[in-house]
A protein has these predicted regions:
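Membrane-anchoring hydrophobic helices of lipid-metabolizing enzymes
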Residues: 41-123, 133-135, 142-144, 162
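Non-catalytic C-terminal accessory region of glycerolipid acyltransferases
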Residues: 43-47, 176-313
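Conserved nucleotide-cofactor-binding alpha/beta core module
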Residues: 141, 145-188
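Active-site pocket-lining segments that scaffold enzyme catalytic pockets across diverse folds
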Residues: 126
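Short hydrophobic alpha-helical segments enriched in small aliphatic residues
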Residues: 8-9, 28-31
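Structural motif
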Residues: 121-123, 167, 192-196
Length: 313
């Protein structure tokens, strides 16, 4: 009789070569992203050129099929097509043009709840991991001057949207300059802030797609900056391949968030032709978050308020 899977048993040892290959691929992929982050003058994504210029030794060692695979993985062709068709735009106009080019449409409920004279921290679930940030710019960017969204730094590769984003490094140490930029934005009364308090893309948990526990820092930021909090619910999902990879990662005990390697694919391919619904809730005064609960408990309460909006979607 076959023994149950044991992380310390024979079956795991048999999977070690695969585990090591996935880990190496993961590191190479994010090295490329870091290299590309330094190519701010580039108007097109060229994976091979980046490797040749920034990592010549790696370029000499990599076989041609590996470079081709990386181009496919990051959707180089599709992303460059988007840049070519939308490069004349910037900020909200770029997000709107990108959505039109990809035939992505939206339904928005409760937009009137965001008042012009308010001082807000808007929070949302994070089902897509990348394109939901772009979607919010397309929907809210014109309505809310000075909108800044705290996002995965992978999106900083889109030059036309840098003015809207504040980057967070989810796979390494956060840059001091980025941390300081986020702090300045929270203190600026002319900026409306938005964040995804889970910090990671939604997962398949307990039979449904949902965020992991929200970070308590969302409450701390709201109180310290005296911003009322607006919960928002984004109805959408990634491909089954994405969730399958995440399930496979957990089964193998891989700690790295290798699902991130599929985010460009989800954004450039899977999102095409999709319709997303956004539901905006009532502002919650920051004074609500008193000492009756810890910041961690308030963060989970806020998460519940977000998902309660689902019934209106």
């Amino acid at each position: 009789m076959e023994q149950p899977f044991n992380h310390h048993g024979t079956r795991q040892r048999r999977m070690e070569p695969f585990f090591n290959s996935v880990t190496r691929l993961y590191h190479i992929f994010f090295v490329l992203l870091q290299l590309y982050n330094g190519q701010q003058d580039m108007k097109r994504i060229d994976i091979e050129l980046i490797i040749r210029n920034k990592a010549p030794q790696l370029h000499r060692k990599l076989p041609r099929f590996a470079i081709g695979f990386m181009k496919w993985l990051v959707c180089q062709k599709q992303l460059n097509e988007i840049l070519e068709n939308c490069e004349m735009y910037e900020g909200p106009d770029f997000a709107i043009a990108m959505s039109k080019y990809m035939n992505v449409t939206y339904s928005v409920q409760g937009l009137e709840k965001i008042k012009d004279d308010g001082h807000y921290l808007m929070v949302s679930n994070h089902p897509l991991g990348a394109y939901d940030g772009i979607s919010y710019i397309a929907v809210l960017g014109k309505k809310i001057p000075g909108l800044k969204i705290v996002v995965n730094d992978i999106l900083m590769n889109i030059d036309q949207l840098r003015c809207m984003f504040l980057p967070v490094n989810t796979v390494g140490r956060q840059k001091r300059s980025d941390m300081e930029a986020i702090e300045r934005a929270y203190r600026d009364e002319n900026i409306q802030m938005m964040s995804f308090p889970a910090g990671f893309c939604s997962r398949f948990i307990d039979g449904k797609i949902q965020d992991i526990a929200w970070k308590k820092s969302v409450i701390t930021k709201a109180i310290d900056s005296k911003r009322d909090v607006i919960p928002m619910y984004f109805k959408g999902r990634n491909s089954l391949v994405f969730y399958g990879l995440e399930w496979f990662r957990r089964i193998l005990g891989i700690k790295f968030n290798i699902g991130l390697i599929l985010l460009p694919w989800q954004m450039a391919r899977y999102a095409r032709g999709k319709h997303y619904t956004i539901v905006i809730g009532d502002p919650i005064p920051y004074q609500t978050f008193d000492a009756s609960r810890s910041h961690t408990e308030w963060a989970q309460w806020l998460r519940e308020q977000c998902y309660n909006l689902k019934k209106n979607s």
